[in-house]
């Protein structure tokens, strides 16, 4: 029986995976917004946010039960991503002269931490109040080929200002890579009760980014940061997504749309900065993404292909858009990019805020 505004049945998310219990956690705020999270993968399953008329609707893509999650039916929908969000070329990297080899699960690349990344792990969960969920996971030395025991604390908070705040902290006992993010697919049209999720091509996007990261045919950076001026990646002024994602530009063709990392215009390293504003004129919903990270992977849902999700809604191609705050792809093998090596005695710290409003 549903006990939440999203219409989700908590029993559908209750299971035991690798000896750990999974459950659905419901966060609410004073404005009536609601976020449902499963501790399997730290997955944001649903997010009820108001439109300009105050009507609540689910604005993220999620799966309707734990079994689909375990079967890896679109495994990254709403999930926590690690140890390394995005791609590492050839599944190889070197730290302090030691080469490490990772699974190649995306062409010859290692994508999102390997064959079994954080999206498929059961996190220890503690709901500290109506608005806050604390998730903990220890990635053991050698997991998916990464060195060091990595202890992660990830905190989800739904504020009274309709912000989804995700705070990450991590420590290690060996030099390792740490590049965490969230892979929510947003749909500001709202998907509740719809047979098919509407496409997000009617959204208007603005990016606080003067440069982006061009890639090769298998999505590995070519090693430079390129000005967006004169390219379909120039969102410094508001632009309709539909006008850009089918451009004849080679980079657009490589990604079958937008699937690129953008360089956020940060004044100081690690400073919380507005990275993106996405607006849906049809509903009035506005999503503003703030982060302490240097990069924002924008993905226009080009490879969504008919997965049936929450409420029986079909997720068609381009029915969600991702704003994945992180370090740039393959940065460990790209000397011109900001690095994400974490050493013993240091604390990895990252905060991303998805702030919702209406206009």
Language-model segments: what does each one mean?
Residues 2-359:
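An exposed, glycine/acidic-rich loop-and-rim segment of catalytic or binding clefts
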